[in-house]
């Protein structure tokens, strides 16, 4: 019985910690500039990418990993959404903290047409403890939504929501 009580306490502490970290995360990552200050990114040629260069565009940053099956599951829908939203000024950036060769191999194997980036640092740098996690930024670079978990990006509801931003 003592083990079960300890387990319940540990689970409760984890839940309270997660609630606190989400609140902190939302305050710290309010715009693309604050995200750029927290971390740096490189493309698959190891060239530094400045996120502030995307100001003027709506940006979806999706944090994922090659080992994350929910992340991979949502990618076909994301490809369709990217095509549907091409006239709505959206840029999709898929960010992983894995090494460039692993990301490149995944991109080449799957033949996905995304802007794949490597974050220099871990997902914890962003306050991300669950994958996939996506941030949606408006044209001014202000974060308008954080989505934790799998998204059906090509659903009518999501497409309409993204068109409305």
Model-identified regions with their sequence ranges:
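Short pre-active-site segment immediately N-terminal to redox-active cysteine/selenocysteine motifs
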Residues: 57-59, 63-67, 130
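Conserved redox-active cysteine motifs that mediate thiol-disulfide chemistry
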Residues: 63-80
